[in-house]
From Swiss-Prot:
Disruption phenotype: Cells lacking this gene are shown to be highly attenuated in a mouse tuberculosis model. Required for growth on cholesterol. NCBIfam families: PRK07792.1. It comes from Mycobacterium tuberculosis (strain ATCC 25618 / H37Rv). GO terms for molecular function: 3-hydroxyacyl-CoA dehydrogenase activity; enoyl-CoA hydratase activity. A reversible dehydrogenase involved in cholesterol side-chain degradation. Catalyzes the oxidation of hydroxyl-cholesterol-CoA ester metabolic intermediate (22S)-HOCO-CoA (3-oxo-chol-4-ene-(22S)-hydroxy-24-oyl-CoA), the product of ChsH3, has no activity on (22R)-HOCO-CoA (the product of EchA19). Also acts on (3R)-hydroxyoctanoyl-CoA and 17-beta-hydroxyandrost-4-en-3-one, but not on 7-alpha-hydroxyandrost-4-en-3-one, uses NAD(+) but not NADP(+). This is Hydroxyacyl-CoA dehydrogenase ChsB1. SMART domains: PKS_KR. Its EC number is 1.1.1.-. It holds the Pfam family adh_short. It is an enzyme of class 1 (oxidoreductase).
């Protein structure tokens, strides 16, 4: 159904103005997080930028926000710390509240420790799960508790809250050599869907982005940026992702909750949930093991052996 003025929800607006809003962006010293922080600031948001201390020390993101977004009244505050530590998540929330309140969270921080599964160490597994999944959880939980408490005193029990969590197509596909990364990203998607269902009643919108972006973390995957003609943009430029994040963080996204988006160049793909391929029903009240074995064996004997739950078709589009 096409939205018109007569059927548009009262919560729906076209505005992406973030003046007066406070956002937290993790992994914001460089790459995608830096671009997202700048993008939100250009819309008027005050941004709490987070990264590890060494990355922030080498970053110009705070100065860049000050220079690029001064006309919008935005500013940036840096909070150094490991996002996998609860103390960092607590400090990020406290900083946002000190600036007027937490409105937007963009969880972006991440690392890779690629290795074939049979060679992967405990440390390589734990490090990736800690930064990606635990890091997302800690700040998401803090934001959820803050918004829920705030909603108790709000008119109509609703507040403005936007949660944008960064997953990956790896979590839908399961790439060889990235068992840790894929597991963490799949977990982030599930975490966000749970948050969306829990927080939607309070007016909070929680969504997932799966970006294809050329950053330092993905350099080994995507390589160096190509030469582009004047006026053109690299298909893997983080700026493509920023446009979607600006929307999802804004009042205009009030009706968007619990969704998964893939961003690649000028294309934004909305991903549908898994569908049922086939249901196998017993003739009686339960399956006889021999009959179930024969039924499943015969079905898979005529099926493409390369077809699995892995969403490989998404990678080809």
């Amino acid at each position: 159904m096409k939205l018109t003025e007569s059927n548009r929800s009262p919560r729906t607006t076209n505005t992406t103005d973030l003046s007066g809003k406070v956002a937290v962006v993790t992994g914001a010293a460089a790459g995608l997080g830096r671009a997202e922080a700048l993008g939100l600031a250009r819309l008027g948001a005050t941004v709490v930028v987070n990264d590890v201390a060494s990355a922030l020390d080498a970053s110009d993101v705070v100065d860049e926000i000050g220079a690029a977004a001064a006309d919008a009244g935005a500013k940036a505050v840096a909070v150094a710390g490991d996002i996998s530590q609860r103390a960092t998540a607590d400090e990020l929330l406290a900083s946002a509240v000190g600036l007027g309140g937490l409105d937007i969270v963009v969880n972006n921080a991440g690392i890779t420790r690629d290795r074939m599964l049979f060679n992967m160490s405990d440390e390589e597994w734990d490090a990736v799960i800690a930064v990606h999944l635990r890091g997302h959880f800690l700040l998401t939980r803090n934001a959820a508790a803050y918004w829920r408490d705030k909603a108790k005193d709000a008119e109509g029990g609703s507040v403005f809250g936007r949660l944008v969590n960064t997953s990956s197509e790896a979590g839908l596909v399961g790439p060889v050599g990235q068992a840790n990364y894929a597991a963490a990203k799949a977990g982030i998607t599930a975490l966000t869907l749970s948050a969306a269902r829990a927080l939607g009643r309070y007016g909070v919108c929680a969504n997932v982005i799966c970006p294809r972006a050329r950053t330092a973390m993905t350099a080994d995957v995507f390589g160096a940026a190509p030469d582009v003609e004047a006026g053109q943009i690299d298909p893997l430029s983080p700026q493509h992702v920023v446009s979607l994040v600006q929307f999802l963080a804004s009042p205009a996204a009030a009706e968007v909750n619990g969704q998964v988006f893939i961003v690649y160049g000028p294309q934004v793909t909305l991903v549908s949930p898994p569908h049922m391929e086939r249901r196998f029903s017993a003739d009686g009240t339960s399956w006889d093991p021999t009959e179930l074995t024969a039924t499943l064996r015969d079905y898979f004997a005529g099926r493409d052996p390369e077809q699995s739950f892995s969403a490989t078709d998404l990678m080809r589009q």
